[in-house]
Amino acid sequence: MQDQIRQEKIVGSRRFSNYFWASLLLVGGLMFLLAGISSYLKINLLPFANTTELVFIPQGIVMMFYGTLSFGLSIYIMATLFWDIGSGYNEYNKVENLVKVVRRGFPGKNREILLTYPLNNIRSIGIKISEGLNPQRIIYLCLKDERKIPLTPVQQPDSISDLEDQAADLAKFLDLKLENL
């Protein structure tokens, strides 16, 4: 029975890089915000810098704007970490003849995203590899109606050989052909 069902866990937004950026943006945003407020009130709110000498109209306002923007972005990233957006699993079930793609979304009526496809509706397993400034290495579930459902999580791309091995192993398990997109 165990050789008929395969489940792959998908890590969502709870990755080290998101914790790092949320922390950095929070601290940096608060520092910029305090510097802008210090320039307006002429009270030094930062112990390591004298921000009372900043002119409020061009510099203080800009620092407050950037600080507010950075603070807001860090709150957004923290919310995605708290809700664990993008996590889930892919389940390949030969017993029920189904493939399930389950992901967590933002709170609301569509919090749990569930995509279910019968195995006879799947044409192949596809691999898309693009290099450059934003490299992408993605395994797709290619359906007969020409839709392509991504199966790999959004993260640092794996090596090409690892991705090809994963895709070949999945195609062999599901008895499907492998294609390059």
From Swiss-Prot:
The chain crosses the membrane at residues 19-39, 61-81. This is Photosystem I assembly protein Ycf4. It is found in: Plastid, Chloroplast thylakoid membrane. GO terms for cellular component: chloroplast thylakoid membrane; photosystem I. InterPro entries: PSI_Ycf4_assembly. It comes from Thalassiosira pseudonana. Keywords: Chloroplast, Membrane, Photosynthesis, Plastid, Thylakoid, Transmembrane, Transmembrane helix. Seems to be required for the assembly of the photosystem I complex. The keyword Magnesium does not apply. PANTHER family: PHOTOSYSTEM I ASSEMBLY PROTEIN YCF4, PTHR33288. Belongs to the Ycf4 family. The keyword Ribosomal protein does not apply. HAMAP family: Ycf4 (MF_00437). Pfam families: Ycf4. GO terms for biological process: photosynthesis. It comes from the Eukaryota. It is a multi-pass membrane protein.
